[in-house]
Amino acid sequence: SFYNVATKEMEYSGVLSERYHDQSHGQSFFSVLMKQTNKNGLYFLDEPEAALSCQNQLALLYLIEECVKQNCQFIIATHSPILLGFPNAQILSFDEDRVEEVDYKSTSSYQTMKLFLDRYDYFVKDIQENNDGGVL
């Protein structure tokens, strides 16, 4: 878990560390990213949106862009339509038992979010009228 990562980072650093456990999950996650990214780095992120608000997902895009300028690369597993929207990203879809490169606007994450935003009033009405307390 990220809690364990933050704990180990404090143990390994040997210097007065950020007080990750005194911050929210998203704040501490973003702090670690900002502190630990270096030139020529290769970074693997697994669903970073789980820790980040929409605003911080946008901030992460800017951080990634700054890192890319320093020859860094990122491999990110995500369902976030925001993170998938990184300019010129190579997007690989693992849907339907095969791996294929896809265009941003053809991802299910983008299409689902666009449908929700375009038809928000419909979804609100449908939820209010048809939800019996179960999962949609």
Regions found by a protein language model. Name each.
Residues 14, 26, 41, 85, ...:
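Residue-identity detector for glycine
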Residues 23-47, 55-67:
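GG-anchored amphipathic helix commonly corresponding to the ABC/SMC/Rad50 NBD signature/C-loop
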Residues 55-76, 80-136:
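C-terminal lobe/lid and adjacent interdomain/linker elements of RecA-like ASCE P-loop ATPase modules
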